[in-house]
């Protein structure tokens, strides 16, 4: 009986295991689970969105129907539906969905920052008076100086009389209208 040479397997035709182009990428089971869990969380975020926000996100009809169903389901059925949504997301390109969701979140954050700035400006208007009114008029030249002064005067009276800050709220609403009409 003859013994085969040790390198006999190297000469098999069509064997290109060591080809540099066919690099095998090994992914751990834990990493696959983490990715699946992340997609499930993305699905849960989509389920928590309202109808108007969902309209702004690029979803196909199957995924949209699954999300709308999950919004109606409670308890254990919801968990299973979230699992299904996660599975559906694994089969799709989720980058456009993530980008649209980030855009929605960013818009909300920008609105919160704007409201804080307007609240600060309102407080300055009440404390500083005409100096702050001049600043508002430089920001928004079409603002009504007389209306602002009247609201500031009423807000100061309410503050001195320990009354509810109705005029302060009106100042904030007026500033918000000015900011919205500008953009």
UniProtKB/Swiss-Prot annotation:
Q: Where would you find this protein in the cell?
A: Cytoplasm
Question: Chief location of this protein?
Answer: cytoplasm
* InterPro entries membership: DarP (IPR006839), DarP_sf (IPR023153)
| One GO cellular component term | cytosol
**SUPFAM superfamilies xrefs:** PSPTO4464-like
* Parts of the chain that traverse the membrane: none
One BP annotation, GO: assembly of large subunit precursor of preribosome
Keyword line: Cytoplasm, Ribosome biogenesis, RNA-binding, rRNA-binding
| Gene3D superfamilies per UniProt | PSPTO4464-like domains
CDD domains of this UniProt entry?
YjgA-like
- What GO molecular function terms would the record report? ribosome binding; rRNA binding
Q: List the PANTHER family.
A: UPF0307 PROTEIN YJGA
The UniProt family comment states: Belongs to the DarP family.
UniProt-listed NCBIfam families:
PRK05255.1-1 (NF003593)
Please describe what this protein does: Member of a network of 50S ribosomal subunit biogenesis factors which assembles along the 30S-50S interface, preventing incorrect 23S rRNA structures from forming. Promotes peptidyl transferase center (PTC) maturation.
Record-given protein name: Dual-action ribosomal maturation protein DarP
What species was this sequence derived from?
Salmonella paratyphi A (strain AKU_12601)
- Gene this chain is encoded by: darP
């Amino acid at each position: 009986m003859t013994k085969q040479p040790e390198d006999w397997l190297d000469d098999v035709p069509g064997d290109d295991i060591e080809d540099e182009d066919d690099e095998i990428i090994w992914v751990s089971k834990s990493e696959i689970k983490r990715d699946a869990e992340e997609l499930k969380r993305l699905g849960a975020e989509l389920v928590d969105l309202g109808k108007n926000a969902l309209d702004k996100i690029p979803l196909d009809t199957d995924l949209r129907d699954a999300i709308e169903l999950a919004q109606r389901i409670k308890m254990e059925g919801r968990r299973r539906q979230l699992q299904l949504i996660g599975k559906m997301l694994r089969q799709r390109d989720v980058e456009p969905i993530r980008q649209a969701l980030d855009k929605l979140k960013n818009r909300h954050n920008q609105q919160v920052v704007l409201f804080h700035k307007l609240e600060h400006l309102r407080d300055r208007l009440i404390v500083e008076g005409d100096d702050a009114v001049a600043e508002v008029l430089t920001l928004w030249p079409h603002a009504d100086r007389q209306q602002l002064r009247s609201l500031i005067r009423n807000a100061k009276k309410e503050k001195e009389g320990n009354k509810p800050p109705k005029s302060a709220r009106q100042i904030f609403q007026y500033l918000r209208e000015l900011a919205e009409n500008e953009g």
